[in-house]
């Protein structure tokens, strides 16, 4: 799954929308090599991890 960043998008809001929990924002950052999550650029295409990938990251 992919998401094209628009003005006003925040990683925590995207995590809530796609992963069900805002506090999983770091998984989207890790999956997309984002080092400065407050600096999302409109037009950037983010990869959204699958539920399986998210679970694997949570379990270590």
Model regions and ranges:
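Cell-surface/extracellular proteins and modules involved
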Residues: 1-60
């Amino acid at each position: 799954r992919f998401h094209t960043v628009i003005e006003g998008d925040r990683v925590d809001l995207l995590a809530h929308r796609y992963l069900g929990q805002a506090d999983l924002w770091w998984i989207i950052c890790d999956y997309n090599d984002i080092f400065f999550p407050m600096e999302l650029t409109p037009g950037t295409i983010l990869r959204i991890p699958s539920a399986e990938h998210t679970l694997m990251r949570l379990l270590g």
